Design a protein with these regions (language model features):
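Short acidic DE-rich linear segments
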Residues: 1, 102-115
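N-terminal low-complexity, intrinsically disordered segments
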Residues: 1-45, 74-76
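Secondary-structure junction/capping motif
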Residues: 2, 30, 92-103
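Intrinsically disordered, low-complexity segments enriched in small/polar residues
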Residues: 8-9, 79-82, 100-102, 108
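Amphipathic protein-protein interaction modules
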Residues: 44-99
Length: 115
């Protein structure tokens, strides 16, 4: 796995979280999904909330990836982490992950590739 694939997988996970928050009939509703339904929002309010949660998830996932890359704090610690896949291949050394994460979370790389 490359650092680009790793960042893409984080982005796909973010999309799955966002979808689970707003699914009409989920098999296993998340706590967030239940709370949003309890709010009985209008369609416009639901879209605005979805935008807010989308931005929040972007910020959270992107910041975690930056933290793993040593570009940001995780808690009170800022250091570079080396990430390996299950076959002991180095996924990310220093700096590679930040560049890929930026492309996915701020430049819509996934959406551009999908269309």
């Amino acid at each position: 796995m490359t650092s680009d694939e790793f960042a893409k997988n984080f982005y796909l996970e973010k999309l799955a979280f966002l979808k689970s928050c707003f699914e009409a009939q989920p098999e296993q509703p998340s706590a967030v999904n239940v709370k949003i339904k309890e709010m009985a929002l209008t369609e416009h309010q639901t879209e605005k909330l979805k935008e807010v949660i989308d931005i929040l998830l972007d910020d959270v996932f992107y910041t975690i990836l930056l933290g793993l890359d040593g570009e940001s704090h995780i808690g009170n610690t800022q250091q570079v982490y080396k990430i390996y896949d299950q076959d002991d291949n180095l996924i990310s050394d220093c700096g590679e992950l930040e560049a890929s994460a930026y492309e996915y979370f701020h430049e819509s790389k996934y959406e551009k590739e999908s269309h």
